[in-house]
Amino acid sequence: WAHALAGLDARAVVLAAAFDRSPAPVAALLRLARERGATSVLLTNRRVGPLPPLADVLLVTPAASQDAMFRTRVGTLVVLEALLDSVAAVHPELRRAAAVEEVFTALGGYITC
């Protein structure tokens, strides 16, 4: 994602998501957004930790029970899908999912590095 972030500026909104842990790449992304003047939104199930202070907007989707052995990510995924659908509805010119799927189909699958 270095290529996509190279032009990051104050007009951008960065959406980051983290569940249970605080991955270093997410922290780096939030710091980069702040340095470039972009607005950052963090979607997470934790109100405290190293990531929330780095975000301009914090969206918390707590698990049903923090004590459960297997916590669900359903709430986080629902909010993420709602945000992406809302952006696509307001800015149809930013829709890329169909184009990405066309590339995957043309290449015969996903390419990983």
Model-found features: residue ranges?
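Internal, active-site/partner-interface "lid" segment
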Residues: V90-C113
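Glycine-rich phosphate-binding loops that contact phosphosugars or nucleotide phosphates
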Residues: W1-V90
